Amino acid sequence: MYSGNRSGGHGYWDGGGAAGAEGPAPAGTLSPAPLFSPGTYERLALLLGSIGLLGVGNNLLVLVLYYKFQRLRTPTHLLLVNISLSDLLVSLFGVTFTFVSCLRNGWVWDTVGCVWDGFSGSLFGIVSIATLTVLAYERYIRVVHARVINFSWAWRAITYIWLYSLAWAGAPLLGWNRYILDVHGLGCTVDWKSKDANDSSFVLFLFLGCLVVPLGVIAHCYGHILYSIRMLRCVEDLQTIQVIKILKYEKKLAKMCFLMIFTFLVCWMPYIVICFLVVNGHGHLVTPTISIVSYLFAKSNTVYNPVIYVFMIRKFRRSLLQLLCLRLLRCQRPAKDLPAAGSEMQIRPIVMSQKDGDRPKKKVTFNSSSIIFIITSDESLSVDDSDKTNGSKVDVIQVRPL
């Protein structure tokens, strides 16, 4: 329970949630008194309203761009759209409940509202981290194992992501832990404090299944991706203009994915730290002010991903500029200046085999998402002088779009 000066938000929480040990109750008992001053509630409402509007606008824009422009419809972008859909739903449902409560100086919803707020927040948060994990794995099997990813694979992955997230978010609805009012009194979350074996086991497995394992998979995948790119750059026979472009593309894509993961962790880390404190019996250190700040950081993650897409993916940037010209400025670039939908190619595996009198043969596989380069050693095929680099003989380079 919270104790201390409720009007100023000073005091502490014992980690059991504002609802106490009895779980969610009718609205009147969930938040018996305001935890912040009226001015603080107004500022919180302004911040949450801004986060909600930006989250809805930015993520809705990503969905519109994906729908309108054929060039954006790739399996990788479909995974990015899944994150945007999750963030859009967070902005519509999760932020709205807290925003209205700020306007009313406290939680105004009943038990069902509390359960829905906790369930939706958990569901969409797990969807985001699970999609980032699948995105890392997708890059891993394309780059390291040189396998092609199609839409069927992407749709199956998204289906499993939502089923996996529903299982974890729905467990408290079936009696494995529960959703209670958070310490700041403006939203609901899992009961982190409970020492009951049933509740504690859920918290333990939730940390493992939705934090430790995903981060481990992400670290493993990107470690191998960076190693593969580094090995490819060390092979002198592949230092052609085309391959250099591929390396730049992959490096940029790796930076984008890393930035998305880094942003997610930065936004959610304060909340995760608070949960660890509560689980380990240090809930008295968590004040309502600290709790609401961590909540704002977590919800702000819904705003950043679309900005990352636009700034780091040229296809999104071109599509956005074209949409603005067509819809807002009423000026359309000449057709010859606009890239035709589907005209851009995707990079697939590079398989390289070299011949050099005294050196052993090397085989390098590399995968990307824009063009397929296959460098083979078929003696029946001829090769241009431009395909020979550094005194080595490369028999043929085949390039074909996906």
Swiss-Prot record:
One matching Pfam family: 7tm_1
Entry's induction text: Induced by low-level blue light (453nm) during epithelial wound healing. Induced by ultraviolet A light in dermal fibroblasts.
Residues with a covalently attached lipid (S-palmitoyl cysteine): C325
Topology class, membrane: Multi-pass membrane protein
Segments on the Cytoplasmic side according to the record's topology features: 66-77, 138-153, 230-255, 313-402
GO terms, biological process: cellular response to light stimulus; cellular response to UV-A; detection of light stimulus; G protein-coupled receptor signaling pathway; keratinocyte differentiation; negative regulation of apoptotic process; negative regulation of melanin biosynthetic process; phototransduction
Self-association state and partner proteins as the record states: Interacts with MC1R; the interaction results in a decrease in MC1R-mediated cAMP signaling and ultimately a decrease in melanin production in melanocytes.
Protein name per Swiss-Prot or TrEMBL: Opsin-3
